[in-house]
Amino acid sequence: MSLPPIRLPSPYGSDRLVQLAARLRPALCDTLITVGGQEFPAHSLVLAGVSQQLGRRGQWALGEGISPSTFAQLLNFVYGESVELQPRELRPLQEAARALGVQSLEEACWRARGDRAKKPDPGLKKHQEEPEKPSRNAERELGDPGEKQKPEQVSRTGGREQEMLHKHSPPRGSPEMAGATQEAQQEQTRSKEKHLQAPVGQRGADGKHGVLMWLRENPGGSEESLHKLPGPLPPAGSLQTSVTPRPSWAEAPWLVGGQPALWSILLMPPRYGIPFYHSTPTTGAWQEVWREHRIPLSLNAPKGLWSQNQLASSSPTPGSLPQGPAQLSPGEMEESDQGHTGALATCAGHEDKAGCPPRPHPPPAPPARSRPYACSVCGKRFSLKHQMETHYRVHTGEKPFSCSLCPQRSRDFSAMTKHLRTHGAAPYRXXLCGAGCPSLASMQAHMRGHSPSQLPPGWTIRSTFLYSSSRPSRPSTSPCCPSSSTT
């Protein structure tokens, strides 16, 4: 009997950014993840919102252990889609979510398993409650108690390598202390030679030592490589704050190249830095990897700095980390801000002097059209005399234009022309052939085509008019007198 499928609803379906990215995918994807020979395009901004490990740009691959189908289900969950899977697929998906830092998917898998089993795995619960114990290989490397006083761990904090001594530290003048100091200086010298190493491996769930994946920048070029180095892993606190074990196949992804990111469609400048996640604090190793690629920006940043930022973000070198400008100290930032503000103030106050180009002045507005003719009744003004006379007929009620086809009368010629179109006729019609013409000049040209012998006696051009005008002669004292003053 087959069990019913399990449905995991995604909490990111209501996020507008995730919805937009899901509709655009695979367009504008700046991340290409290879899993088991299959490539999955994605947006680094969406991945960074759910996991600190996945929020990287470029092309990288996951190690063995995660199947392409499991990773496809994880991506669908991240992009706001509900995932339906069989009960046998729940545990691999939960392990993949735990290894890649997708806490929301891991919790959803826990709830789904709790609904079915009503209790969590006792072995995993015991492992979460008890702190991680060192393996036998690590105890062998520690050696006898006399060797425990030697430097045991080297951790990165804020981009510097600091030696942490176990229990008791030797005196300053002792040979052991001198050797430790010399070794620390050698480590710093090697780090200055662009050997940037950050362990991103994980300890296996069975307590055995896993394989460390190291990030290294080659001095001869910008290409990076992954080196597998066997040996004991660094303490869990230096890389991950959670004590939950992760399988050895959870190899961290690796950034190889950059592509145009999703920030461009949101009109936001690209940000290089640590991917954010609300439940996973930033660690020293991540600070070391990403510290050199943060771009200091201020509200009054100089134009050159913005140009450099845009150039660095828009044209990255394939196979290399995105290079930003050199970091500025607080004093340099303040000096550049003051210099830029002062230059703007100088240009604003002295536009006509040398060194500051004058601002282009807007073209002057055209002068207002004069209206010398005013109505003596309502005071309305007009630019042309015939406009004023036509308006005056509103007060007198005069309609001098009458239609020859019906009793319709109009106040002006344009209104009569519109009325004649309702009869399907033009203002002028030949009495011989019935052809209509839109203007008096065209009617005169049309009548020249007829023989004069065909015209009836006493014919005039006015006989072609389809309207009649009974405008009386204007008195000498016009009610609408021109005015010399303009408003």
Swiss-Prot record:
Record field: compositional bias (Basic and acidic residues): 113-166
GO MF term list: DNA binding; DNA-binding transcription factor activity, RNA polymerase II-specific; zinc ion binding
Entry's localization field: Nucleus
Zinc finger map (C2H2-type): 373-395, 401-423, 428-450
InterPro entries linked to this entry: BTB/POZ_dom, SKP1/BTB/POZ_sf, Znf_C2H2_sf, Znf_C2H2_type
Biased composition (Pro residues): 357-369
Region Disordered, residue ranges: 113-208, 308-371, 468-487
Biological process annotations from GO: regulation of transcription by RNA polymerase II
Annotated coiled-coil segments of the chain: none
Gene Ontology cellular component terms for the protein in this record: nucleus
Domain BTB: 29-87
Keywords: DNA-binding, Metal-binding, Nucleus, Repeat, Repressor, Transcription, Transcription regulation, Zinc, Zinc-finger
Keyword Transcription regulation: yes
Biased composition (Polar residues): 308-320
Main location: nucleus
Family that this chain belongs to: Belongs to the krueppel C2H2-type zinc-finger protein family.
Domain notes: The C-terminal zinc finger domain functions as a transcriptional transactivator. The BTB (POZ) domain possesses repressor activity.
Free-text function comment from the UniProt entry: DNA-binding protein that binds to the to a 5'-TGTACAGTGT-3' core sequence. May function as a transcriptional transactivator and transcriptional repressor. Probably exerts its repressor effect by preventing GATA3 from binding to DNA. May play a role in regulating the differentiation and activation of helper T-cells.
Record text on subunit structure and interactions: Homodimer (via PTB domain). Interacts with the N-terminal of FANCC. Interacts with ZBTB16. Interacts with GATA3.
Protein's name in the database: Zinc finger and BTB domain-containing protein 32
Organism: Pan troglodytes (Chimpanzee)
Taxonomic placement: Eukaryota, Metazoa, Chordata, Craniata, Vertebrata
Chain's gene name: ZBTB32
